[in-house]
Amino acid sequence: IYTYKCNDNNYTSIEIVDSKTNIEIDKEKNEIKFIINNKANINELNCDINIQKAKELIKLENNIKKDMKKSIYTTIDKLISEYNADICGFKELIYKTYPNYYKELEKKYGAEILKNLNYKIDINLKLVAKGNILKEITNE
Protein backbone atom coordinates (compact mmCIF):
# COMPACT_ATOMS: atom_id res chain seq x y z
CA ILE A 1 0.00 0.00 0.00
CA TYR A 2 1.35 3.42 -0.94
CA THR A 3 -0.33 6.62 0.19
CA TYR A 4 -0.04 9.75 -1.93
CA LYS A 5 -0.89 13.16 -0.48
CA CYS A 6 -2.63 15.11 -3.26
CA ASN A 7 -3.14 18.27 -1.18
CA ASP A 8 -3.05 19.42 2.45
CA ASN A 9 -6.06 17.38 3.54
CA ASN A 10 -6.62 14.63 0.97
CA TYR A 11 -4.91 11.37 0.15
CA THR A 12 -5.09 8.58 -2.39
CA SER A 13 -3.91 5.09 -1.58
CA ILE A 14 -2.85 2.44 -4.05
CA GLU A 15 -2.03 -1.22 -3.63
CA ILE A 16 0.92 -2.42 -5.68
CA VAL A 17 -0.13 -5.77 -7.12
CA ASP A 18 2.88 -6.45 -9.35
CA SER A 19 6.38 -5.04 -9.20
CA LYS A 20 9.49 -5.89 -11.18
CA THR A 21 12.85 -4.19 -10.83
CA ASN A 22 15.68 -4.21 -13.37
CA ILE A 23 19.11 -3.09 -12.26
CA GLU A 24 21.89 -1.78 -14.49
CA ILE A 25 25.43 -0.86 -13.48
CA ASP A 26 27.45 1.79 -15.33
CA LYS A 27 31.06 1.40 -14.21
CA GLU A 28 32.22 4.59 -15.95
CA LYS A 29 29.76 6.75 -14.02
CA ASN A 30 29.95 4.74 -10.76
CA GLU A 31 26.18 4.51 -11.16
CA ILE A 32 23.53 1.96 -10.36
CA LYS A 33 20.23 2.42 -12.18
CA PHE A 34 16.99 0.92 -10.89
CA ILE A 35 14.07 0.60 -13.27
CA ILE A 36 10.96 -0.19 -11.23
CA ASN A 37 7.83 -1.32 -13.07
CA ASN A 38 4.69 -1.31 -10.90
CA LYS A 39 1.08 -2.22 -11.49
CA ALA A 40 -1.33 -1.00 -8.84
CA ASN A 41 -4.97 -0.80 -7.89
CA ILE A 42 -6.54 2.36 -6.51
CA ASN A 43 -7.74 1.50 -3.01
CA GLU A 44 -8.98 4.90 -1.97
CA LEU A 45 -9.39 8.17 -3.83
CA ASN A 46 -10.04 11.29 -1.77
CA CYS A 47 -8.58 13.77 -4.24
CA ASP A 48 -10.43 16.07 -6.59
CA ILE A 49 -9.62 13.93 -9.63
CA ASN A 50 -12.00 12.45 -12.18
CA ILE A 51 -10.36 9.12 -12.98
CA GLN A 52 -13.05 8.48 -15.59
CA LYS A 53 -11.00 10.77 -17.84
CA ALA A 54 -7.86 9.12 -19.21
CA LYS A 55 -5.84 12.39 -19.03
CA GLU A 56 -6.58 12.80 -15.34
CA LEU A 57 -5.74 9.17 -14.64
CA ILE A 58 -2.38 9.59 -16.39
CA LYS A 59 -1.78 12.79 -14.42
CA LEU A 60 -2.50 10.89 -11.18
CA GLU A 61 -0.09 8.10 -12.21
CA ASN A 62 2.64 10.67 -12.96
CA ASN A 63 2.11 12.49 -9.66
CA ILE A 64 2.28 9.24 -7.69
CA LYS A 65 5.45 8.16 -9.57
CA LYS A 66 7.10 11.50 -8.80
CA ASP A 67 6.15 11.21 -5.12
CA MET A 68 7.38 7.59 -4.89
CA LYS A 69 10.68 8.53 -6.49
CA LYS A 70 11.17 11.40 -4.03
CA SER A 71 10.42 9.11 -1.07
CA ILE A 72 12.87 6.46 -2.25
CA TYR A 73 15.67 8.98 -2.87
CA THR A 74 15.10 10.65 0.51
CA THR A 75 15.19 7.32 2.34
CA ILE A 76 18.28 5.96 0.60
CA ASP A 77 20.16 9.27 0.89
CA LYS A 78 19.48 9.45 4.61
CA LEU A 79 20.46 5.83 5.27
CA ILE A 80 23.71 6.21 3.34
CA SER A 81 24.74 9.66 4.61
CA GLU A 82 23.81 9.18 8.27
CA TYR A 83 24.29 5.45 8.82
CA ASN A 84 26.36 4.23 5.85
CA ALA A 85 23.65 1.54 5.58
CA ASP A 86 23.32 -0.52 2.41
CA ILE A 87 19.68 -1.62 2.60
CA CYS A 88 19.45 -1.99 -1.18
CA GLY A 89 22.45 -4.30 -1.36
CA PHE A 90 24.41 -2.00 -3.70
CA LYS A 91 27.80 -3.38 -2.66
CA GLU A 92 26.74 -7.02 -2.96
CA LEU A 93 25.19 -6.36 -6.36
CA ILE A 94 28.38 -4.77 -7.67
CA TYR A 95 30.51 -7.51 -6.12
CA LYS A 96 28.46 -10.30 -7.72
CA THR A 97 28.19 -8.59 -11.11
CA TYR A 98 31.65 -7.04 -11.40
CA PRO A 99 33.96 -8.47 -8.70
CA ASN A 100 37.10 -6.78 -10.06
CA TYR A 101 35.34 -3.43 -10.29
CA TYR A 102 34.14 -3.86 -6.70
CA LYS A 103 37.74 -4.48 -5.59
CA GLU A 104 38.79 -1.27 -7.35
CA LEU A 105 36.05 0.68 -5.54
CA GLU A 106 36.95 -0.91 -2.23
CA LYS A 107 40.62 -0.05 -2.71
CA LYS A 108 39.78 3.53 -3.73
CA TYR A 109 37.04 4.34 -1.18
CA GLY A 110 37.31 1.72 1.58
CA ALA A 111 34.25 1.83 3.82
CA GLU A 112 33.00 4.91 1.97
CA ILE A 113 31.98 3.06 -1.22
CA LEU A 114 28.30 3.89 -0.75
CA LYS A 115 28.92 7.59 -0.34
CA ASN A 116 30.81 7.63 -3.64
CA LEU A 117 28.26 5.73 -5.71
CA ASN A 118 25.64 7.42 -7.83
CA TYR A 119 22.26 5.87 -8.28
CA LYS A 120 19.29 6.63 -10.46
CA ILE A 121 15.71 5.49 -10.04
CA ASP A 122 13.17 5.28 -12.85
CA ILE A 123 9.63 4.31 -11.92
CA ASN A 124 6.88 3.16 -14.25
CA LEU A 125 3.38 2.91 -12.78
CA LYS A 126 0.19 1.63 -14.34
CA LEU A 127 -3.05 1.89 -12.39
CA VAL A 128 -4.87 -1.25 -13.53
CA ALA A 129 -7.97 -1.37 -11.32
CA LYS A 130 -9.91 1.69 -10.34
CA GLY A 131 -12.61 0.19 -8.13
CA ASN A 132 -16.29 0.57 -8.90
CA ILE A 133 -16.82 3.19 -11.58
CA LEU A 134 -20.27 3.82 -12.95
CA LYS A 135 -19.14 5.47 -16.21
CA GLU A 136 -16.63 4.38 -18.80
CA ILE A 137 -13.19 6.07 -18.92
CA THR A 138 -12.99 8.52 -21.83
CA ASN A 139 -10.04 9.84 -23.83
CA GLU A 140 -10.70 13.49 -22.93
Predicted stretch roles:
Residues 1-140:
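Active-site environment of non-heme Fe oxygenases that use a 2-His-1-carboxylate facial triad
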